[in-house]
């Protein structure tokens, strides 16, 4: 979780100090972090698609647990979705973030922390990404460097379908969550009938 937080803060720092579009920075650091994961995997002695394994049974069983009849990954997804919905759509923090995304100059004139607030948001997103990574590692039973590689386009599709503006300033957490579920179910359905999901 701390590594996810650190990666999010690095993204925020790069966006802040370079002035490059957040989408470009995020895609660039995707490959940077992927290379780091490949390096760590090689240092741990994992070869090919084997990944780092040998996790305790309690950890690998976590992704298959249920809570009130619902799978734990779905429960975590719902909890994280509600958390981000509350902070972005029901509080001052979210209103300030949307204003910073729409018009940073006006936000600066309104005495908002234009430089500090994105650090908080990217840090939170980094922690949420780390939670998702832990669930995936628990589900597959190994930490592979390429585990989330095929999720880039579905994630971007879900964000855009959910109403997010790729240039910032607008979006809906609930809409994006519903779009992510829709894209995921479409992928699974296509695989079940034998159609490639690319």
Where on the chain are the PLM-derived regions?
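Alpha-helical transmembrane segments within multi-pass membrane transporters and channels
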Residues: 1-30, 178-183
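Helix-loop interface residues and adjacent transmembrane-helix termini in multi-pass membrane transporters
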Residues: 17-19, 90, 116, 167-170, ...
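Hydrophobic/aromatic residues within transmembrane alpha-helices
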Residues: 32, 106-107, 160, 182
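Helix-loop-helix "hairpin" substructures at the membrane interface of multi-pass membrane proteins
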Residues: 1, 5-11, 66-143
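Transmembrane helix-bundle core of multi-pass membrane transporters
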Residues: 22-91, 117-119, 139-148, 195-197
């Amino acid at each position: 979780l701390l590594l996810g937080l650190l990666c999010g803060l690095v993204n925020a720092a790069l966006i802040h100090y370079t002035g490059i579009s957040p989408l470009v920075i995020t895609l660039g650091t995707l490959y940077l972090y992927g290379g780091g994961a490949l390096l760590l995997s090689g240092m741990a002695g994992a070869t090919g698609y084997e990944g780092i394994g040998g996790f305790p049974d309690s950890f690998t069983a976590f992704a298959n647990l249920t809570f009130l009849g619902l799978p734990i990954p779905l429960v975590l997804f719902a909890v994280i979705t509600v958390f981000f919905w509350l902070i972005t759509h029901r509080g001052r923090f979210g209103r300030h973030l949307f204003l910073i995304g729409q018009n940073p100059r006006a936000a600066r004139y309104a005495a908002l922390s234009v430089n500090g607030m994105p650090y908080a948001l990217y840090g939170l997103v980094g922690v949420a990404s780390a939670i998702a990574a832990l669930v995936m590692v628990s589900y597959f039973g190994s930490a592979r460097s390429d585990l989330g590689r095929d999720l880039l386009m579905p994630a971007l599709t879900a964000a855009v379908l959910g109403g997010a503006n790729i240039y910032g300033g607008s979006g809906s957490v609930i809409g994006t969550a519903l779009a992510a579920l829709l894209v995921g179910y479409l992928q699974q359905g296509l695989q079940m009938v034998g159609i490639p999901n690319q």
